[in-house]
Amino acid sequence: MSPGYLPAPKAVLGSVPEKHLAEEDEVDSILLSASKILNSSEGVKESGGNEPEYGCASEPENQIQPQSALKVLQHQLESFQALRMQTLQNVSMVQSEISEILNKSIVEVETPQFNSEKSLVFSMHPEKDLPNETQEEIPSTKTLHSMGETFSSNSDTGLPQGTDIPPQIQVKDMLALQGLRTTADNSPPKKAMNTSEQPSATKSFSLYQFLPQGPQTAVPQAAPVILDKSTITTPFPKHGFCANLDDICHSIKHMKEELQKSHDKELALTSELHTFQADASTQGHHKHEPFPMHSSKLNFIQQENMEGNLSEDMKSKRISELEALVSKLLPLRDTVSKLHVNFCRKCKKLSKSEVYRGKKNEKNKDIPITSKNIMDLKFHSRAPRYTLSVLDLGKHKIKDKEGQAFIVSQGPATLENEKLPKGKFIPEQCVPKQSVAKIHYLQNYLKESLQNQKKMTELENENLALKTKMKPLVFTAQSLIQKVEAHEKQLKSLAEEKSALQSKLSKAEEENKDCLRELKKIVSTYNVLGGQHKMLEEKNSQLSLEKQQMLETIDHLKSKEHKSQSDMAVLQNENSRMNIEIEAMKTSMLLVQDEREMLEKETYQLLKDKSTLESDLKESKLEILQLKEKERLIKAEQESLLHSLDTAKAEKLSLEATLQESTSTRQKLERKLVDIQAYQSAAEEKFLKEIKSAKSETSIYKNNLAEISKECEILSKMVMEIKADNQILKEELKKHSQENTKFENSISRLTEDKILLENYVRSIENEKDTLEFEMRNLQRDYLSLSDKVSSQNNSASKSTYISRREKLYFDNYDAYEDASSLRNRPVASDLKGIPHKLYQRLPSKICK
């Protein structure tokens, strides 16, 4: 399609209300936020799964328990992420359900408002009051109804019978409806119908009309009316592209009430005919020609009866078509909300060769919609809306042409007098051809892509089978190659050894002496290595001691790990709190599911009402057939009575009386119609209130969604905080490992200092032993000297005089030596053999 035929985006978007666009944008934003949350959760999961176990390579024995703590943390994180994924899945389910509810509330359509005063006119007027278009009214209704039938047949039988129709193929019906609505909104009214033809048009288009008509311009009576989809101004709903099932059911009920009214009218007519029969039986022997005025009135009655039968047939057909539409729309309520199918912008860029290619392949009309095609259509769903409306317009004009052909085949007499200039319809004929070519090109492109996909899947399956067959062969070949390489290496080594042995054997005599020398050197080196081995064993013993010391330091670190475990307990408490919040979210989800079940129950009740309506329709059809048979009998009797009625003036008076009675009955019926219209308006107000309540519920669901998204963000923040805590713990583990190395170095230094101190203590103990030995010798000398002094005192008196001075001298000398020894010995209890009196005198004598 050339870009010149594209409508302006504003013109197309003008038919769509701004509320509908705003709500769709809100739904898209909610879905985008949910997809972002899901992607972030997947990224968190991947980052959490790919976290390296830090600090496990260098010192495994020192970090066994930190590894276990990290594993516990990772398990907790994985469980928390699994719970989070479940909550996100539940949130996505709630979002999908809310989007369905939003689509249902967006698709609000008012019930059809029929012009009851014009559609149910059963009064008997003379021929002077009749318009010229009464003869054209019946074929117009036929043509309009045939157009509705062709539309429904095209929407029903879109695929060939050989192909299996998937459930997604029913989207074409909705696309056709959308195309019809866009064409009706965008096409200017070329020739509107006359005011006398409005009831038939409203009746024939009741499948697609759910709002009162706009202003219509009158046409002169001589000009015929072309019943094309673009010429008729059919208003469509303001709130969406799809009809609401509740409104359709209400329209079915309204039409059923009209049928009952028509039945009542027919019963009244039959009663009048029975009165005619009674009058005719009294005056049956009189046979005269009818008066012209009576004949004209009776012809008008016949025409009115024919019109009533046709209108009843039209009503029954319309009700059946509405029920078929309802049966189609019920399974599509869930799928259409998810599949707002928009075509790609590539439709604008088709070349002339591609158009020619599409014209050649006109026979291949329909392609089964597969899951891949649906994904492609979803991928291109962000295209502008005017491309979709243009393509739907092209599709619908193809169906209009088929409907026009069907109209011409049924009623050629009505279309002979229709003459309009051809120049007005040239662009309308060019547009469908190009749209047909583009549609066929897209269908062929989809078919080729499907065939390529099938081939690719078959080749991939064959490749997988061959790979599975090749795997054991590859393993066996690799094992054989490895064995051959090993054998070749062995053969090479054996050949080299053989050559070396031959050379050695040739030089054995010369090298024996050198070998003996080398053996001696080897023995000497062996002895040296034995000494080194002993040294290494001693070093190993020292290392074992150091290992014990390290174990003690590890015990010290375990105490620190207990603290970290207490911190982990705090984290577990936080996790339990998060689990409680998740359970609360689950309860809210259960409430949403209960509400969904209530909605499903309401739909089930609607289906039951539909089945009852269908049974009532069947009964009404049977009654209509019986009434038709009765009317035929009555008409035959009327023809026999006409000759007798003309002769009697009394019969004229009775006919006038019956006419007055019919007018009175007509007035009563009109009053009843007014009451029914009032009841209908009250029912419409009730339905509007229910729709408002549904909108408020959707707003509540949106708020719940926003709260759930906020809670998901809070959960993601908590996960990020836990990750940060893990990183902090890892850094602390690094610090602890560094401190362990420092402690090890300090322990090695302390061991060296300890060895030095032990050596120093041993030297001090040796000195102590030597001093004790000297003290004992001095005590012995002291005792011997005291004995000598006592013996000398006993021997002579002179010696007694001098002995006191000598005793004091020796006492002072011993006290001095004891004081010098006490400077090296801080404890006085170790001085054995010294008298207590001398020990008490020491400070005074040292001061002297």
UniProtKB/Swiss-Prot annotation:
It is found in: Nucleus. The modification Phosphoserine is found at residue 620. One of its GO terms (cellular component) is nucleus. Disulfide bonds: none annotated. It comes from the Eukaryota. PANTHER family: CILIA AND FLAGELLA-ASSOCIATED PROTEIN 58-RELATED, COILED-COIL DOMAIN-CONTAINING PROTEIN 110. This is Coiled-coil domain-containing protein 110. The gene is Ccdc110.
